[in-house]
Design a protein with these regions (language model features):
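Non-catalytic helical "accessory" subdomain of NTase-fold nucleotidyltransferases
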Residues: 1-467
């Protein structure tokens, strides 16, 4: 905080100094402005983020149309947020069965169509944010995945086993060329094109839980606006096939998720909070380097959402980047120290509850975060992507960034044309895209050779441009 004082955490330790002089404040603000400009060149600006989001929304519509009403598909995670390049991370996709509805206790089910299978979500024996699904009524249309995952609870009731459900999908034959990987949480991961493209697919069920969303919407807040709150509520909830780690009922429990709503929330953050989010993800990935998912991108996302909700939006401007990055680091430090971080949508659920964080690792991370807070703006030199961009800044970065972003836009166009089953040899748009991609790669390769680089493999160059 720019108050000149010291900040104490929940254990009473002094954790970070404030900005102590007008000169220091000006330095911080100048560094913040320069860093924001740099990140725009790196592909984190608002226009490229929006273009990515639009491209994946188009794919989502096409995928859902192919399901002919049986399921709704949408992209989640960093791709839906517009924060990663085409090959930079996994494509997270959620596919929600439209023939099943789960409803929380107390909700009337008499008006639900007879074609729909109804499952009652019971949460008394589960950790917050999780539930067990009891069969209330089989619909006239029920998939084999649901039918075969039903089992007896020992009290003459049928419940839906999350373990049986996801295992059925793991054994389901995918598109030709897909390589199925081991289960990760609720997802069934796979790779395509020889491991170049990675996809995490989660099969989920609709959940109607008005009480949870009403409590979330009623919270006093500075952000988001009421219309965004109502949009999040309207998008509803799903349950995914994964129980609380260590629970006696883990194999039959399901986790409540708000992926569609969280997409909307992240996409309505101010530009500065998006950049704080990106930098915190880099800290997680490149500085802390968790080995067992002790801290995840989801952890970081929740920290950013809490900061945004509690902060007057007028304070979230370009010059304050490092102030809010400090706040994010501080919150991350407290979460690691106390092993407590409330889930933004269901505060009763502690995201650090099942964290396998060892004591020595915790102390090391706390020390590292404290050092970063003390370093001020130069902390970003710890981040390899930022450091490489600074070395190339301004002209080489500007030149390369323009071609890299154009290459990504062309790849997203090709992705959407491919989803429409357009042939790359006969479709005019596909031919133009492929021609321009080849031209860009030759331009970049020629400049690399001119500057003394011996690398001239176009396939490797293409891959590196989209990472």
């Amino acid at each position: 905080m720019a108050d000149g004082g010291n900040r104490r955490n929940v254990t009473g330790e002094v954790t970070k100094p404030g900005v102590s002089s007008r000169h220091s404040l000006i330095q911080y603000e100048h560094a913040a402005t320069e860093t924001c400009t740099l990140m725009d060149f790196m592909g984190y600006g608002p226009h490229i983020r929006q273009a990515r989001r639009d491209a994946y929304k188009t794919v989502d519509r096409l995928m859902t149309a192919l399901m002919c009403g049986s399921a709704t598909c949408f992209t989640t995670g960093s791709k839906a947020e517009g924060l990663t390049c085409f090959l930079e991370s996994d494509i997270d996709v959620m596919c929600v069965d439209n023939n099943v509805i789960c409803i929380e206790e107390g909700v009337d089910s008499s008006n639900i169509l007879k074609e729909t299978t109804i499952l009652r979500a019971c949460s008394q024996k589960s950790y917050p944010g999780h539930c067990i699904l009891l069969l209330e009524r089989s619909g006239t249309t029920i998939t084999t995945f649901v039918h075969n995952a039903l089992c007896d609870d020992g009290y003459d009731h049928e419940l839906l086993s999350s373990a049986l459900y996801i295992n059925a999908w793991l054994n389901f034959k995918r598109t030709e060329g897909a390589v199925i990987l081991d289960r990760v949480g609720p997802s069934t991961p796979s790779t395509y094109y020889g491991g170049t493209l990675h996809q995490d697919l989660v099969h989920a069920l609709h959940l109607y839980c008005p009480s949870i969303l009403t409590r979330w919407a009623a919270r006093p807040r500075n952000w988001p606006t009421n219309n965004i709150v109502q949009k999040v509520v309207s998008l509803g909830t799903v349950v995914t096939p994964v129980g609380f780690k260590g629970s006696d009922y883990e194999h039959v429990e399901w986790r409540l998720c708000f992926n569609a709503g969280e997409n909307v929330l992240v996409n309505n953050l101010t530009d500065i909070m998006v950049k704080v989010y990106v930098l915190l993800k880099m800290v997680k990935q490149d500085v802390l380097k968790p080995r067992k998912k002790e801290v995840t991108s989801f952890t970081v996302k929740n920290i950013v959402l809490w900061i945004a909700e509690k902060t007057p939006q007028s304070l979230l401007h370009e010059r304050s980047l490092f102030q809010w990055l400090h706040e994010g680091l501080y919150a991350l430090r407290v979460a690691i120290d106390t092993k407590e971080l409330p889930y933004y949508m269901i505060p009763e659920r502690n995201l650090m509850a099942a964290c396998a964080l060892e004591h020595e690792q915790k102390l090391s991370w706390i020390a590292t975060i404290n050092d970063m807070i003390e370093e001020g703006p130069i902390m970003i030199l710890r981040l390899p992507k930022i450091r490489r961009a600074l070395i190339a800044h301004p002209e080489p970065l500007r030149w390369y960034s323009g071609r890299r972003i154009e290459m990504e836009m062309l790849e997203l166009i090709a992705m959407n044309r491919g989803a429409l089953d357009m042939d790359e040899d006969t479709d005019v748009i596909m031919v133009a895209v492929l021609t321009r991609k080849a031209d860009i790669m030759k331009e970049v390769r020629d400049r690399m050779i001119t500057e003394g680089c011996r690398e001239n493999n176009l396939h490797d160059l293409y891959h590196s441009m989209l990472l």
